[in-house]
Regions:
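Contiguous transmembrane helix-bundle modules in multi-pass membrane proteins
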Residues: 1-162, 167, 249-271
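Accessory, solvent-exposed terminal regions and/or long lumenal/extracellular loops of proteins
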Residues: 134-270
Length: 271
């Protein structure tokens, strides 16, 4: 019941953030946008206890059990989660106020759920959903902390160094389509071990005259490499933006796990 109340609150916040700007524009003709700070301030403080109750809730009989009956293994896992989270947050210089509690409780849920998979009489649909949710929060946190970005103006033949990589702007291929012209840039991302080729596009449409950019993304199990380039006024120069976004694929996997848990739960009720 507690988890359901939290979920209703989170969904209400998202609904308000989506619908409120539309209503305001209709009523007052005033345009506003609701960004991440709104969601951070409302959701994160409630997300921390939500993760905690997801971890311990399935193992506690709320009416019969007392706090003293909380499993000692849970306390040990909680301490391990604190230590790992503190080391990580301290190493990467992340804000302690909200990041540390989020890391602690998402790790706690992650470890508890893995342990419970090997227990007796487990609710498999519930565990899959809880594991997926903990993986989702951890992946988002790690993505936010470890993501890297570099932007610079480059010409064909230029190369720049970013972290341990070299970004090489090799050439541009111009192709004429039916109603637009496309500029395909060829970039090589070189590091010590391998080379990655990315080919983002700039599309110049005829009527009306519009310029759009199409990013090229290379996905691996650990990170996505994202590159996009745009035309700027300086002759021969293009603005090139390269991003490394860790654990993006795990965000999608976690969403699939949450959905799978929900489907299994519905099938179980219908049996």
């Amino acid at each position: 019941l507690i988890n359901n109340l939290f979920m209703m609150f989170f969904l209400s916040v998202v609904l308000i953030g989506t619908v409120y700007p539309i209503f305001l524009e209709v009523i007052n003709n005033e345009k506003i946008s609701i960004g991440p700070p709104f969601y951070h301030k409302l959701i994160i403080p409630f997300l921390i206890p939500f993760l905690f109750f997801m971890a311990i809730g399935p193992n506690i009989k709320w009416i019969k059990d007392k706090m003293g009956k909380i499993n000692l293994k849970d306390i040990f896992i909680f301490i391990i989660s604190i230590v790992i989270s503190y080391i990580f947050v301290n190493k990467f210089g992340v804000s302690y106020l909200l990041s540390l509690p989020l890391f602690i409780f998402s790790l706690f849920l992650f470890f508890v759920t893995i342990r419970d998979f090997f227990g007796k009489n487990i609710n498999i649909s519930q565990k899959i959903s809880h594991f997926g949710f903990s993986l989702l929060i951890l992946s988002i946190l790690l993505n936010g902390v470890l993501a890297k970005e570099h932007s610079s103006n480059m010409r064909v033949g230029d190369e720049i160094k970013f972290l341990d990589k070299i970004i090489q702007f090799q050439n541009i291929e111009v192709i004429k389509k039916q109603n637009y012209q496309t500029l395909i840039g060829k970039f090589n991302i070189v590091d010590k071990n391998n080379s990655l080729s990315l080919k983002p596009e700039i599309r110049i449409y005829d009527q009306p005259e519009t310029i759009t950019s199409e990013a090229d993304i290379s996905s691996t199990i650990f990170a996505d490499n994202f590159l996009v380039f745009n035309i700027i006024k300086n002759d021969g120069f293009y603005n090139v933006r390269y991003q490394i976004k860790p654990f993006m694929i795990w965000i999608w996997i976690s969403v699939l796990l949450i959905s799978l848990g929900g489907i299994l739960s519905l099938k179980k009720k219908n049996v």
